[in-house]
Amino acid sequence: MVNSLSRILFCSLLIFSVISLREERLETAPITDDPWDLDGPCQKYVEKLAVVQSEMVACATNWSIPPVVCTKCFQNYINFKQFEYETKNLNNVYSLDNRTCSQVIYDNYLLSYSTDISKALTSEIWEKSRCDSCITIKWNFPQNKSEVSFSERTMQFQNRMYEWRNCVVNYTSGGVLDDNLTNGSKICNLCKTTFDELFGYYWKIYTTPDVDFCVDVETTMNDTIHLWDDVWKCAEKQDRNRDLFGIMITFGTLLLLTALFYAASYIQGGGETRRLIQYARLSDPHGQRSRLLSSGMSDADLVSRVSPGSSVLYNVPIHQTR
């Protein structure tokens, strides 16, 4: 029985070793073993580029509600741009037809999926999110030591956001979505100061010309306002009444200005209604003037109407008297 167990164990170990060796060979086998793969030496670089691109896509998708890709995915973006730089400088690695791998990846074919995906990640995600307004990346591709720094206004916003959230957590014992968070409750009163400071700072930056926040800050602030006003009902009725009163004052002012405008126009006109001339009822013009103004009369016709014995001379063009 001991021999049987030994054989079974030995066979199991042998099978496991064969499977492991096969998987290891598949993972480490050079792509150039395929004689039909013209670009075999470049394939491993494309595979690694695909990995960093997919990691950036996954991070952006995971942090898309709300979109906070700038503050959550900056390291993935750096990794992606770093290896993109490396693939564009593969000048010492060649395909089987002696083209550099950089040419193979980016210039060798009618379509370059690597280029299209890289452009989409850069322009459609990073740049459209205005990440440069919140984050500054000091690129150092040759040394692979790029550094990240957050802008001062972004840090100030995050600090105020943390202060407000800490206030909410402290008074709710960690249960942020507490049933008692209704209008007039303690949390709305105790954390109103920190919320007003947060919103005041955001609004100051938002209304400053030529100064932008990244999308991360804008969407985070919008969600915070909805949470405070609509979910927790912390918006004061006095604030809402003040807004309604302001709208009514504006509307009343517009009506008053319109009435004054028409009153001033009536007074300047002497209080009389304007008389409109109906040209359709006027009689047709008569006499010699109508004949002179007739569009069908030429200079030659005018001369022919003068009697032969008349002493009146007309300056008629030569080409019309011949």
Swiss-Prot record:
Keyword Membrane: yes
InterPro entries: Osteopetrosis-assoc_TM_1
Signal peptide: 1-20
Glycosylation sites: 62, 98, 144, 170, 180, 183, 222
GO CC terms, sorted: cytosol; membrane
Cystine pairings recorded for this chain: none
Gene: cup-15
Family per record: Belongs to the OSTM1 family.
Entry function: Modulates the transport of substances from the endosomal to lysosomal compartments. Plays a role in lysosome formation and function in coelomocytes.
Keywords assigned: Glycoprotein, Membrane, Signal, Transmembrane, Transmembrane helix
GO process terms (BP): lysosome organization
Protein name per its UniProtKB record: Coelomocyte uptake defective protein 15
Pfam families per record: OSTMP1
Membrane topology qualifier: Single-pass membrane protein
Phenotypic consequence of gene deletion: RNAi-mediated knockdown results in the accumulation of substances in coelomocytes within the body wall cavity, which may be indicative of lysosomal defects.
Domain of life, per lineage: Eukaryota
Transmembrane segment boundaries: 244-264
Taxonomy of the source species: Eukaryota, Metazoa, Ecdysozoa, Nematoda, Chromadorea
Subcellular location: Membrane
